Amino acid sequence: NSTMDSLLQLGR
């Protein structure tokens, strides 16, 4: 899921 991936990247 790209949306979830994006959120996780921001929280890296």
Swiss-Prot record:
Record's protein name: Uncharacterized protein IMPP11
Source organism phylogeny: Eukaryota, Metazoa, Spiralia, Lophotrochozoa, Mollusca
Tissue: Nacreous layer of shell.
